[in-house]
Amino acid sequence: MKTKYMLIPLLCALSACSSTETDTSVPEIIPVGEATAPLNCQEYPRGGAIFFDYLFRDDTELGAYNIEIHNNFDHHTHSTEAGECRQDPAKEPVNPWILNKDYPIPAGNTSFEAKLTIPVPADVDPGEYHFMIRLTDRSGWQQLKSVSIRVTDPV
């Protein structure tokens, strides 16, 4: 009888074992040639649109991505791009553009081209903004790409 009860935990332990493969690499955010947008220092008019186009890759499986846009009127930084964009004097926001949205990636993908049309609200404060892309793989590894963009008055 004791053997029977000792066998149950052993079977549970053995069946719970998984592959020894461990995902230790972060996913990649890759520009798509001429189509890539946004890029550092690009300008977008209020009431216009950002045509987002990036390729995401991972060695095992992609998870999801997030787009965040927030003002940079105080000149803080977390850009992952080399080079500085033209800066206006620091200012207080009145009606800043704030966007923070998650997007799923279909299960099983190791490569995914993300294409979105992101409308620029017509009533937001013009000025400097950060456009951040967060890409997470199924294991939880995350890659961040942050570029500076400028919202302008329409011509």
What is each residue range found by the language model?
Residues 18-21:
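Bacterial signal peptide processing site
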Residues 2-9:
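Sec-dependent signal peptide recognition
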Residues 9-10, 120:
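Exposed boundary/loop context
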Residues 27-155:
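First exposed extracellular module after export/assembly in secreted or surface-exposed proteins
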Residues 23-25:
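N-terminal helix-cap/turn-to-beta initiation motif at the start of protein domains
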Residues 13-16:
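C-terminal motif of bacterial Sec signal peptides marking the signal peptidase cleavage site
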